[in-house]
């Protein structure tokens, strides 16, 4: 009996701790209309930027910006690497490959080649995870367009914008101008895809129908597309399953 209780007690502790660590909702609803909560400033972080990226075929340099965390008297990057100075990891904000920039990026600055001036993408607090240059659209329509997946609202009301908030989708031109949200507030971006033959950008979002703060199979999937040959970037909704 003594041996049995020795095994049961840790299991009970594990069950209790798992219940305490239940996944927090991505959305906390207050009123019918969106409330913009103040973002808490983290005084342990300093702003840094990667060296500029030149996307082939464009006349702009892109400067990814992020944050470098200083904790417990030592330096820590967003990736979790800890050291006094680690040139390979600690100061790296983003990665670039095949016309796509990835990372946890707080903003961008754009610089036209031949100019010394840098232009900020947005004044809003955001967290960008991916930026994709639509090269085939540029080749076909002469429009140089970037697609962003990012969080732009503190939807779970924890005082910060991070990967625990709802992800949405934006577009801009290669200079950072026309930075436009094409997703809907409080709808989680599922995925997006470019049909090169028609220059149509398709994307899906999930609406929290039951307002339980979580996104699951009981909620509604919305289907959208944009004809990128049109410069107004008008979003159309369609129903492939009806």
PLM feature segments, named:
Residues 18-22:
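Bacterial signal peptide processing site
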Residues 127-147, 186-202, 238-242:
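Conserved beta-propeller blade repeats
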Residues 106-112, 162-175, 218-230:
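Beta-propeller blade signature
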Residues 42-103, 141-157, 199-206:
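Short beta-strand elements that form the blades of beta-propeller/WD-repeat-like
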Residues 27-51:
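Post-signal peptide N-terminal segment of mature Sec-exported envelope proteins
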Residues 1-16:
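Sec-dependent bacterial lipoprotein signal peptides
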Residues 119-124, 179-184, 232-240:
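Beta-propeller fold detector
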Residues 155-163, 208-217:
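Acidic, glycine-anchored loop motifs typical of Ca2+
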């Amino acid at each position: 009996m003594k041996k049995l209780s020795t095994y049961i007690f840790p299991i009970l502790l594990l069950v209790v701790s798992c219940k305490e660590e239940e996944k927090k909702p991505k959305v906390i609803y207050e009123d019918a209309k969106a409330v913009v909560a103040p973002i808490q400033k983290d005084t342990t972080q300093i702003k840094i930027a990667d060296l500029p990226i030149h996307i082939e075929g464009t006349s702009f340099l892109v400067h990814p910006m992020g944050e470098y965390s200083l904790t417990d008297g030592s330096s820590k990057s967003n990736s979790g690497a800890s050291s006094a100075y680690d040139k390979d990891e600690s100061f790296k904000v983003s990665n670039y490959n095949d016309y796509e920039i990835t990372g946890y990026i707080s903003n961008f600055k754009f610089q036209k080649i031949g100019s010394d001036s840098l232009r900020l993408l947005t004044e809003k607090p955001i967290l960008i995870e991916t930026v994709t240059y639509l090269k085939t659209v540029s080749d076909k329509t002469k429009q140089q367009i970037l697609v962003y997946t990012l969080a732009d609202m503190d939807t779970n009301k924890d005082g910060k914008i991070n990967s625990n908030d709802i992800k949405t989708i934006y577009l801009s031109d290669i200079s950072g101008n026309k930075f436009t949200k094409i997703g809907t507030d409080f709808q989680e971006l599922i995925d997006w895809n470019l049909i090169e033959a028609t220059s149509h950008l398709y994307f899906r979002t999930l609406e929290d129908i039951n307002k339980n703060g979580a996104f699951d199979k009981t909620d509604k999937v919305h289907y959208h597309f944009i004809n990128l040959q049109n410069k107004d970037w008008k979003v159309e909704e369609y129903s492939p399953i009806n």
